[in-house]
């Protein structure tokens, strides 16, 4: 529902925009950009109509404020007067009015729960929703069970509960120098991408992705541990072991005390994004307007972004936290270009186009080596299981819509034994816009299973390759299966009109829904 108003990055037709399930954009009036909204919030103008007072809002009171010039919306228990924001919302006033006078949390989460609404709307805060009196209960006994790794059944989601007693749990054990936290997921499709670990001071946090849910261990450790730790996964039984090094070789009487949402299993759509600060290690030009950024994770973090998923980068800009989605890439397509001293599990690479008149990317580009950027946990619905027994893989990319294809290419050519052919059709405006052209050509020369075709919409007269935009003629010639009944997957990513048109054309060419994956988040 609430959408960051932006005339900058990702631009309305940018391939790096995380699309939102078919929502239409409306043209904003001049002077209604994100920067204009930030200026308004800093102007000192009373945007709530309450002259700085915060109030407790009842359901009855919230319902009264349901008009365009008097619109209150509740998000996660906080009530905002969004009337001043109406003209700045790219989704239009009608989209905001869907939640007028009501709790808009679910609608907000459906579209873009990643938006930092607390920062964007802090000057519109009316107050909290009034909480109905609740009967107090003694949680001490339950807390004791929680720290023994027993998950209260009330915290198991209905989805997994229906599947039987195989819900996750955890335990811990120790030696003189080590503490091992063991997570029993009861699932067999668990790998190192499934677990995210962050610990800072005495706070320990481990998120395990189990199907469409997240199992959270969140503990204030009873003793200090070293920053470095190791993570092991036993895939055959779905067991994860996190091995911490004690700072002092003493015996622990207990692991620690529970922190927020500890030992809970929550649908991923209902969880907030968790950020950690990553350090900018390098930045290099790839094209005239695209850079390769390398960020280093904290030593106290384990995070591997799964293939086809994205993260959010967050920067403070003029006092407001701005968040944008990006798909991580490999440091290179070719092994000889890769730095062996940089382990994959500690570094994240991004190919990012810089928009000179934008708000976010120029600020990102101004960062110096050693500066920090906040990086979220991964999101996305691409499943690596789509590659099982795959024979033909077709990739359609436009501009920086190439980013999800980087890891897909690396994985496909090294880890899919059944693969016969990979074909990439890469759309750009000019030759100067083609990302990693030389690497793609060298990779295709080395591996005869790979074909790469470049298509330019505004080439110079000397260009001998294909020209134009995505079309039936281009695709019908390009998308030929190796065998009539071979298992095939077509991945497509680019600006929203490119992707939508491409998916329509693929259906016209008789590709089924299961044979198409569009990266629109």
From Swiss-Prot:
The modification N-acetylmethionine is found at residue 1. Keywords: Acetylation, Endoplasmic reticulum, FAD, Flavoprotein, Heme, Iron, Metal-binding, NAD, Oxidoreductase. Residues 54-130 form the Cytochrome b5 heme-binding domain. Heme binds at residues 89, 112. The keyword Cytoplasm does not apply. Widely expressed. The keyword Acetylation applies. Residues 1-18 have a biased composition (Polar residues). Residues 165-256 form the CS domain. Residues 1-27 are annotated as: Disordered. Its EC number is 1.6.2.2. Residues 273-385 form the FAD-binding FR-type domain. Belongs to the flavoprotein pyridine nucleotide cytochrome reductase family. This is Cytochrome b5 reductase 4. The gene is CYB5R4.
């Amino acid at each position: 529902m609430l959408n960051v108003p932006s005339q900058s990055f990702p631009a309305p037709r940018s391939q790096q925009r995380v699309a939102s399930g078919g929502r239409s954009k409306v043209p904003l009036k001049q002077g209604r950009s994100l920067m204009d909204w930030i200026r308004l919030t800093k102007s000192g103008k009373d945007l709530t109509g309450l002259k700085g007072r915060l109030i407790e809002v009842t359901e009855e009171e919230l319902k009264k404020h349901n008009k365009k010039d008097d619109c209150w919306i509740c998000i996660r228990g906080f009530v905002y007067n969004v009337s001043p924001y109406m003209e700045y919302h790219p989704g239009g006033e009608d989209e905001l009015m869907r939640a007028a006078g009501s709790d808009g949390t679910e609608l907000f989460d459906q579209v873009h729960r990643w938006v930092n609404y607390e920062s964007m709307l802090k000057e519109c805060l009316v107050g909290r929703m009034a909480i109905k009196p609740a009967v107090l209960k003694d949680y001490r006994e339950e807390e004791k069970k929680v720290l023994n790794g027993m998950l209260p059944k009330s915290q198991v989601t209905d989805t997994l509960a229906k599947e039987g007693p195989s819900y996750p749990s955890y335990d811990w054990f120790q030696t003189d120098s080590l503490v091992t936290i063991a997570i029993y997921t009861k699932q067999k499709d668990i790998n190192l991408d499934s677990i995210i670990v962050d610990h800072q001071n005495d706070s320990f946090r481990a998120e395990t992705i189990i199907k469409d849910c997240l199992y959270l261990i969140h503990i204030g450790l009873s003793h200090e541990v070293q920053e470095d730790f190791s993570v092991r996964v036993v895939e055959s039984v779905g067991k994860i072991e996190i091995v911490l090094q004690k700072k002092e070789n003493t015996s622990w009487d207990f692991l620690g005390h529970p922190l927020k949402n500890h030992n809970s299993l929550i649908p991923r759509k209902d969880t907030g994004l968790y950020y950690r600060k990553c350090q900018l290690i390098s930045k290099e030009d790839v094209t005239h307007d695209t850079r390769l950024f390398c960020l280093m994770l904290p030593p106290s973090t384990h995070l591997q972004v799964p293939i086809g998923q994205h993260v959010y980068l967050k920067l403070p800009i003029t006092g407001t936290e701005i968040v944008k989605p990006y798909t991580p890439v490999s440091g290179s397509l070719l092994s000889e270009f890769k730095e062996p001293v940089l382990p994959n599990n500690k570094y994240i690479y991004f190919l990012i186009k810089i928009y000179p008149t934008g708000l976010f990317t120029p600020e990102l580009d101004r960062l110096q080596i050693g500066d920090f950027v906040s990086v979220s946990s991964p999101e996305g619905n691409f499943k690596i299981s789509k590659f099982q027994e795959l024979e033909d893989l077709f990739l359609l990319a436009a501009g920086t819509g190439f980013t999800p294809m980087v890891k897909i290419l690396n994985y496909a050519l090294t880890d899919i034994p059944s693969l016969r052919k990979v074909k990439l059709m890469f759309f750009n405006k000019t030759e100067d816009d083609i990302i990693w052209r030389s690497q793609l050509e060298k990779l295709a020369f080395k591996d005869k299973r790979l074909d790469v075709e470049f298509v330019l919409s505004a080439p110079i007269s000397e260009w001998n390759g294909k020209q134009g935009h995505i079309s039936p003629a281009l695709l019908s010639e390009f998308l030929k299966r190796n065998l009539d009944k071979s298992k095939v997957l077509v991945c497509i990513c680019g600006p929203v009109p490119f992707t939508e048109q491409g998916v329509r054309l693929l259906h016209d060419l008789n590709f089924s829904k299961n044979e198409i994956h569009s990266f629109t988040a």
